[in-house]
Design a protein with these regions (language model features):
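HIT superfamily nucleotide-processing domains
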Residues: 1-125
Length: 125
């Protein structure tokens, strides 16, 4: 079910629980600002979720409340994950669903990193 990108943060969401170690995940990267783990239902050969460690619901929330260090650290983490997974040369896609119209499903900011094959056009017309 889609969630609002402007809703208050719910610390019971699945990603908050992963951050606290209450739910297992196959982590492929972590640092002081972010963690990345394999998506449970991959849409491409490589499908990783990158999430900030802080309690942010959406890009709007993150860009308004996160420190400069958190923002920089998160962006750098996304790039580091792509490099670590060998996706820099062949290419990859980043996707962040924010809010109801975009069908955001978890009320914790996250970026999908897709790769491992040619992905084709992003949006069918």
């Amino acid at each position: 079910m889609p969630v609002s990108g402007t809703a208050p943060y719910d610390d019971g969401n699945v990603f908050a629980r992963i951050l606290r170690g209450e739910i297992p995940s196959r982590r492929v990267y972590e640092d002081e600002f972010a963690i990345a783990f394999d998506d449970l239902n991959p849409q491409t050969p490589v499908h990783v979720l990158v999430i900030p460690r802080g309690p942010y619901v959406s890009w709007a929330d993150f860009s308004a409340r996160a420190s400069d260090a958190e923002i920089t650290g998160f962006v750098r983490a996304v790039g580091a994950v792509a490099r670590q997974l060998g996706l820099e040369e062949p290419g990859y896609r980043l996707l962040a669903n924010t809010g109801l119209d975009a069908h955001q499903e978890v009320p914790h900011l996250h970026v999908h990193l897709f790769g491992g094959r040619p992905l084709g056009p992003m949006i069918a017309r």
